A protein has these predicted regions:
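Secretory targeting signatures
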Residues: 1-28
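M14 metallocarboxypeptidase catalytic domain recognition
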Residues: 19-436
Length: 436
C-alpha cells in the first residue's frame, strides 16, 4: 500500500512541475522551437506608426527581439553611448560583394526623434515582413540600420549627446564615443548608399528636405549617384504629399563641411543623402514621411543596384590605385601633434606606417608649401594607396578657416606634414610612434 501511495505522490509532483517523464526529470528538453513567423505587411508598417515618440529604452528592448529573425544576419551592440546605453546595428543579408548595401543612420540629434521610430518600423518590417514583400528586396541589396545613434540625447530631449556635443559635427575629430561608433559601423558594413535621418523646424508648405553631399572632394561617380537618388526621393514625396511639399536642403555655411555625416561618408566613398522631416507636422506624419523616404531609397536601389554598386566600387578602385599626385603624407613622431593625428587616422580605419630606408623624397609642406627631401628611415607616414584616400587629404589638410565647425584640424594642432610628390617605400605599423 505504501509503494502505491509513494508512486502516486511522485507522479503528481512530476506532473505539477511540468516534468512528464524520465527525460524531463533529467533536464533533457525535447521541445521543438517554433518557426519564426513572417506575419507583417507594409500596410502594417503604416498602420502602426506611433502618435508620440517611443522611449529610448523601449526602442532598444524591442530591437533586441529581432535577433530571432532568420533574416537578421547580425544584431550587434556596435558600441555604447556616453551614458552606457547600447547602440544597436541590425544587418540583413549575407553581404554579397556583387550587390549594394543600403545603410540608414537614425537621429544623431536627440531632439529630432521621428527618425528613430521610423528606423525601428523599417527594421521590424524587414525582420518580420511577409516573404513576398521582403525577400525580393533582400535578393538585390544588403540592408543595415543603425536604429538609434543618440539615446542619451533622446532621453534628455537635447540635440547633443550626454556631453552636449553635436554628433553631426564630430565625424572628423571623432572625440565622442557615438562618433567613433558611427565610424566603426560604416567601416564594418562598407555601404554603397548611406542615409542620415534628421528633422528640421519647418518652412511653410515644405514638410520634408533632402540633401545630397556638396563637398567637392567627393568622387564624381559618388556625387552623381547621390544626386540621382536625391531626385528620386523628392519625386516620390511630391507624388504622395503634393508638389512643393519637399525641397533640397538649402545651402548653408556648413554645406561642404566634412564633419557633417552626408559629406563625410560621401568623401569616404558612399553615395549619401540627408533626410529631414518638419517638426511643425504631427508626430505620426513625420514618422510616415521618414519611412516613405526610406522605402523610396530602397526601391530605387533595388531597381538599379548595379549603378549604386558601381559608384562605390569606382571610389574603392581609385583608393586601391592611389593618388598619382600626393603619394603619402610624412610627419615626425617627435611632433607633439602626431599622437592625436595618428589617433584620428586610425579611428577612421586608415593604415599608418613608416618610411623604409633613407632615400630622399621630393615633398612640400601641406600649408607653407616649403620643400623638403630628407626624411630618415622610420619617419611616420600615412600612404594614399588605400580606400578612401580622399578623406585622408581632408584629415591631413583640413583647416579651421575652411568651416566653422571643425576645430581640431592639423593646422590648429600645429601638425607639420609634408606631401610626398613621388612614391615612398613604407611599412605598415599599427604601433607607430607608440614609444614617443
Amino acid at each position: 500500500m505504501m509503494k502505491i501511495v509513494l508512486s502516486s505522490i511522485i507522479s503528481l509532483t512530476l506532473s505539477m512541475s511540468g516534468c512528464v517523464g524520465p527525460s524531463s526529470f533529467f533536464d533533457e528538453d525535447d521541445s521543438v522551437e517554433e518557426p519564426y513567423v513572417f506575419d507583417l505587411t507594409l500596410e502594417d508598417m503604416w498602420n502602426d506608426i506611433p502618435i508620440n515618440q517611443t522611449n529610448a529604452s523601449d526602442i532598444i528592448n524591442w530591437t533586441y527581439e529581432f535577433s530571432k529573425s532568420p533574416r537578421v544576419t547580425n544584431l550587434t551592440e556596435i558600441g555604447y553611448s556616453m551614458n552606457g546605453q547600447p547602440l544597436l546595428l541590425v544587418e540583413f543579408g549575407d553581404y554579397d560583394p556583387d550587390i549594394p548595401t543600403v545603410y540608414f543612420v537614425a537621429a544623431q540629434h536627440g531632439n529630432e526623434p521621428a527618425s528613430v521610430d521610423s528606423a525601428y518600423l523599417l527594421t521590424r518590417h524587414f525582420a518580420r515582413g511577409v516573404p513576398e514583400e521582403v525577400d525580393p528586396i533582400l535578393e538585390n541589396i544588403n540592408l543595415a540600420i543603425f536604429v538609434m545613434v543618440n539615446p542619451d540625447g533622446r532621453d534628455a530631449g537635447s540635440r547633443g549627446n550626454a556631453n552636449g556635443t553635436d554628433l553631426n559635427r564630430d565625424h572628423m575629430k571623432l572625440l565622442e564615443p557615438e562618433g567613433k561608433v558611427m565610424q566603426k559601423a560604416f567601416q564594418k558594413i562598407h555601404p554603397s548608399v548611406t542615409v542620415d535621418m534628421h528633422e528640421f523646424g519647418g518652412a511653410g508648405s515644405i514638410i520634408f528636405q533632402v540633401a545630397a553631399p556638396q563637398n567637392p572632394t567627393t568622387h564624381p561617380d559618388v556625387l552623381a549617384a547621390s544626386y540621382v537618388l536625391e531626385t528620386d526621393v523628392i519625386e516620390s514625396i511630391n507624388e504622395e504629399w503634393g508638389f512643393g511639399s519637399v525641397t533640397n536642403y538649402p545651402p548653408t555655411t556648413s554645406s561642404q563641411d566634412s564633419s557633417i555625416h552626408r559629406n563625410h561618408f560621401a568623401v569616404h566613398g558612399s553615395v549619401s543623402l540627408l533626410f529631414e522631416s518638419a517638426v511643425s507636422e504631427e508626430y505620426s506624419e513625420r514618422v510616415r514621411l521618414q519611412s516613405w523616404a526610406a522605402i523610396s531609397v530602397i526601391e530605387e536601389v533595388v531597381d538599379d543596384p548595379g549603378y549604386y554598386l558601381d559608384a562605390r566600387q569606382s571610389s574603392d578602385e581609385e583608393g586601391q590605385e592611389g593618388n598619382d599626385i600626393v603619394h603619402a603624407y610624412l610627419f615626425e613622431c617627435s611632433d607633439p601633434a602626431t599622437p592625436e593625428t595618428l589617433r584620428i587616422l586610425r579611428d577612421h580605419g586608415f593604415n599608418v606606417g613608416y618610411k623604409a630606408g633613407d632615400e630622399s623624397v621630393t615633398s612640400i609642406h601641406y600649408e607653407t608649401f616649403l620643400p623638403r627631401t630628407n626624411f630618415g628611415n622610420g619617419t611616420a607616414l600615412v600612404p594614399m594607396d588605400q580606400i578612401g584616400w580622399r578623406m585622408i587629404s581632408e584629415l591631413m589638410e583640413y583647416t579651421s578657416t575652411k568651416d566653422q565647425h571643425y576645430t581640431n584640424s592639423p593646422k590648429d594642432r600645429n601638425q607639420d606634414a609634408w606631401r610626398a610628390l613621388e612614391p615612398v617605400d613604407y611599412i605598415i605599423d599599427d604601433t607607430l610612434c607608440d614609444s614617443n
